[in-house]
Amino acid sequence: MALPDLIEIVPLDKPVRAEITVPGSKSITNRALILAALADGEVMLEGALWSEDTQIMVECLQELGFMVNVEPDANETCNRTITVYGDGGRVPPGGTEQQPMELFVGNAGTAARFLAAFVCLGKGVYRLHGVPRMHERPQAALFKALRELGYRVESPTDKLPAVIHGGGPKLGAKCQVSIEESSQFASALLLCAKQGGWEVKVVGENAEESPYVAMTSKLVEAFPHRGGKFQIEPDASSGSYFWGAGWLFQDRENYPINVAQWPGSSWQIDAQFTSYFPPPPSLSRNGQLGDSIMTAITLSPLMPNKVLFLDLGRLRVQECERVFALRTELTKCGAKVVEEGDTLTVCPSKLHGAEIETYNDHRMAMCFAVLGLKVPGIKIRNPACVKKTFPNFFQKLAAAPPNGLGAEIWEIKDGQRTRKLSGDEHFAD
């Protein structure tokens, strides 16, 4: 049974000891899937995230003609062991100008950007398209770089949908790509550069995106390009919700909430969350935190002092306009939040319950669900949007300790609690 359209999180009222496992990193999983498809042999990805975004990537690879086997993971419901049979850098041919091969990328930015570069290594014509929000998200810097390399990209708006004409490898071709809007443009090119024979120069001042480019470079260096096994580490952004939950109740004796196997590779910028939470007087998305800064923003009204969050411009062009969304929904709950340019100042506030609009954004749903563990009356609209990266998030909240937090989650109809959810009803599919 699917998650209801509107749920209420009941605050925790007793100590709990928990160690939470979180699924694999989305960022690493989708990068690894591209590299595995380009490998010369069979690559087994262990601990890979199985969510909407990664399923989209797998389905696109299968549509292209790659053999991809997906097996359950015994340790984590939303992980999989994914085996990809690479063909030495060869990408199967696409369609024709009259009938391009259609690749649907949903609202998955990594799939949209990485596949745009990837299909250039094939022959034939490919059409990438997604949901309406994905058609609003930027692509221009990537398309410009692909054209510099000699590939034909047709898109009147330089966004999706786009028709890409594959031309195979182009040895010695050069391009430069800006990361001012998104690091995914550079990552797309760097993932395919070796097999494409490309020389890629990354330009632009954007410290908040640089860690993601560094992740790509480190992953390319460490990957088993001739076949083998590769372990995906847990997703630090997903782990931030449970570290935040632990802080909410730190004043209670015997209330440790830990995240199992917290990432230690330094590949994920959000692995720094434990160093920046609770947040200092000012905190930037420019090199300090990535998406987990949303967790810090959402919980900041409960801090003893105001916090200034800086360099949030990138949040505006993701799954939703996140700066607006955070300010709007926190204000509903009674928080004092001031937006100036790409900053938010969040002041200590006495919060109350409210119905939270998630804007179909998985991180909005999860951030405010954590707030609901402390603040009575938090109701989450469209909670199933967490399927994008963490389908069993609400199962983790509701499961009995030590594997979960033991929170009650209720369906809401006509403003009233109608029934408490149980078991698989917490899963977003």
Each language-model region and where it sits:
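Compositional signal for N-terminal targeting/processing segments
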Residues: 408-429
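Structural preference for solvent-exposed beta-strand-turn elements
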Residues: 1-411
